[in-house]
Regions:
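Histidine-centered metal-chelating micro-motifs
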Residues: 77-79, 98, 114, 118-124
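Short, conserved beta-strand element in jelly-roll/cupin
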Residues: 71, 84-98
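Conserved short histidine dyad/triad with adjacent acidic residue
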Residues: 68-83
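A short, N-terminal "cap"/entry segment at the start of jelly-roll beta-barrel domains
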Residues: 3-64, 144-145
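Short acidic-glycine-tyrosine-enriched beta hairpin
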Residues: 104-118
Length: 145
């Protein structure tokens, strides 16, 4: 069987749009562009910390995103070291924390930034004598879970 150029063009013009549509999300339920009054965001009091959630959901490009602020008491840690699929960044606002990444400890103070890749074993704790406050930005699979 031989296909002419014309038949090929007709065939491809029907195939490529279908492929492109399959690549698009079925529904755009991404986080909308907005602004937030930080002092009006609710504070959750957890067992080992206080947390103020800023954003949680999907980006328009499909990645999961979660952003929150955590305050740890002196000596406190939100949880034991762990790992997960998404990557995380910490932006330290107040206090002194120790970020452990794959067994190596890093001390971060206000203005310090920490980052872990997907599946790196990590944990954070307040090693100071005053509360420590930091922002967490999580991006990737499961960040919005």
């Amino acid at each position: 069987m031989t296909i002419t150029r014309r038949e090929l063009c007709v065939l491809l013009s029907g195939v490529f749009p279908a492929i492109a549509l399959d690549a698009l999300p079925a529904e755009d339920n991404s986080i909308p562009s907005a602004h937030y009054a930080f002092d009006q965001l609710p504070v959750e009091v957890l067992e080992h910390a206080e947390m103020r959630r800023v954003l949680k959901g999907k980006l328009a490009t499909g990645e999961a995103l979660e952003v929150h602020e955590t305050t740890l008491p002196a000596g406190g840690a939100p949880h034991a070291t762990h790992h997960h699929l998404h990557s995380e960044m910490w932006f330290i606002r107040e206090g002194t924390v120790e970020l452990t990444v794959n067994g190596t400890n890093y001390r971060l103070s206000p203005g310090g930034v920490g980052f872990v890749h997907s599946n790196d074993e990590h944990g954070i704790k307040n090693v100071g004598t005053t509360p420590a406050t930091y922002f967490v930005v999580a991006v990737g699979p499961g960040a919005d879970a």
